[in-house]
Amino acid sequence: MIRVSFEMINVTGLDDAAAVIADAMEQQQHLGVQAMATKAALGRDADYDDLINVSAFSGIIDYQPDELILTLRAGTPMHEVESTLASANQMLAFEVPDLHKILASQSAGTIGGVLATNASGPRRLTAGAARDYLLGFDAISGRGERFKSGGKVVKNVTGYDLSKLICGSYGTLAIFDEVTLKTLPKPETNISLLFPCDDLSAAVASIAGIFASPHEPNAAAILPQAIAAKAGIDVAGAMLAIIRLEGIDVSVADRAAHLLAAHKKGVKLDSDASTALWQQIRDVDLLADADGDIWKLSCAPASAPAIIATLFDHFDLQFFADWAGGLLWLAGPSGADFGTAMRSALAANGNGHAQLIRDSGNSKDLIAPLQPLSSAHYALHKRVKAAFDPRSVLNFGRMHDGI
């Protein structure tokens, strides 16, 4: 969609936003919502008349490392969030991805964008997603009404369900201002164990066996030989299963020794090399130079081999897997055919979700970038949208047509 003209409306707080939303309702207009616009490529192109800019919603409000809570405004840049947490040797456990290389954006964006898209990295497999760490928030709905959910205490579960609903809604239900997140201490150390495998099925099975052991891995990925080479790793097998262990030094060393003894061909990466490798996996840097579109596909790990085999029969593609095989990152040809084939393969292998992340051509004009909804789920989404935003003011159509 090419916009000829629109007004950029800068707001500094929720009272300003309420006035803008009230005016939009009166004029029967739609508003786009953005801060740094680093995730503007995700989802559909919203149908808006004017754009409300919330980048002024920025700054750390309260950080209590001893209580494991961080309160800040949603427009706070991620580099500021990360430096604040690093000052107390803490982190966001869901491991925020920085997709600026594949999205051709200037930075990792804001914490609000992270929450709006529920962006979660490799540790999601064991630690949960972004929505699981949002303790509370202050926001304004598409009705122009301010509301609060949750609180600032880790034990306080009030509002968690609403946090889970608003996270991942792409700004279609409400605009965040103040948010409170649960933080965690950084692990003392981390290492990675590399296990060569003959094929994808063997890699998935190997990882499943390790996760069934008492050795507490917290992340697992699978790299084909050519992708591993991009990360500077020479692989003897067709696939490389990667296991990450984190914790205190003595525990990590003991667990690694047991796993290496049980899997004779395993190789250990030290902490620095392990950290660098998982950053490349988290940020999808390993596909940044690939031609065509990039898709993110969520499925059952056991379904991954059949899905990849089906796609390789028809397309020239590159891929790797995160979340023990449950998250496939794929680079393939632009256009509708690749995405359609992916969704057909998903449907034939237990279902899942395929999302277009990088559109290198005009694929968004030809195929829905987010997984299409069943009629029942579409009706449910419509009802939720009507409850928060009955006039469809906020980011109308950003996720699904007509919502």
Regions found by a protein language model. Give the residues of each.
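Short, conserved charged micro-motifs
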Residues: 79-81, 200-205, 249-257, 303-310, ...
